[in-house]
Curated annotation (Swiss-Prot):
It comes from the Eukaryota. This is UBA-like domain-containing protein 2. Gene3D superfamilies: DNA helicase RuvA subunit, C-terminal domain (1.10.8.10). Pfam families: UBA_8. InterPro entries: UBA-like_sf, UBA_8, UBALD1/2. The modification N-acetylserine is found at residue 2. Belongs to the UBALD family. Residues 128-164 are annotated as: Disordered. The gene is UBALD2. Keywords: Acetylation. It comes from Homo sapiens.
Length: 164
């Protein structure tokens, strides 16, 4: 292959510049050449020139960039919009059924966690330490209900104790 690596790299940079800036390829090539193929410098130059109305007078005037993290575009407009925004405004000003439905549960709503626990279930008591957990003298729950505690469960408990 006789493709020059510099030409290939320059073509890739031009294509990336066109995608990033949205300009024509010939303008991207001119800006990159003027910036000695420094991508960020050329991109910065492109956006600074597009923000200045009379770019041939840009050496006489100092303009702050208008779209940086410190100064978003149309900053005064954004401040004005935020100043009009109130968190409680929507709830107080509108009494529509949709607002009421969004803020309160339906009339037939009965959350399971608000009801009292079933009487057959013993309250859970957290162990004071991991070593004293097996020393609590409470009957082990059986499954299925009514089944007798058999040797299989005792073997399982012994196997669990052996793993510790």
């Amino acid at each position: 292959m006789s493709v020059n690596m510099d030409e290939l790299r320059h073509q890739v940079m031009i294509n990336q510049f066109v995608l990033a800036a949205g300009c024509a390829a010939d303008q991207a090539k001119q800006l990159l050449q003027a910036a000695h193929w420094q991508f960020e410098t050329a991109l910065s130059t492109f956006f600074q020139e597009t923000n200045i109305p009379n770019s041939h007078h840009h050496h006489q005037m100092m303009c702050t960039p208008s779209n940086t993290p410190a100064t978003p575009p149309n900053f005064p407009d954004a401040l004005a919009m935020f100043s009009k925004l109130r968190a409680s405004e929507g709830l107080q000003s509108s009494n529509s059924p949709m607002t009421a439905a969004a803020c309160s549960p339906p009339a037939n709503f009965s959350p399971f966690w608000a009801s009292s626990p079933p009487s057959h279930q013993a309250p859970w008591i957290p162990p004071s330490s991991p070593t004293t957990f097996h020393h609590l003298h409470r009957p082990q729950p059986t499954w299925p209900p009514g089944a007798q505690q058999g040797g299989a469960q005792q073997k399982a408990m012994a196997a669990m104790d052996g793993q510790r």
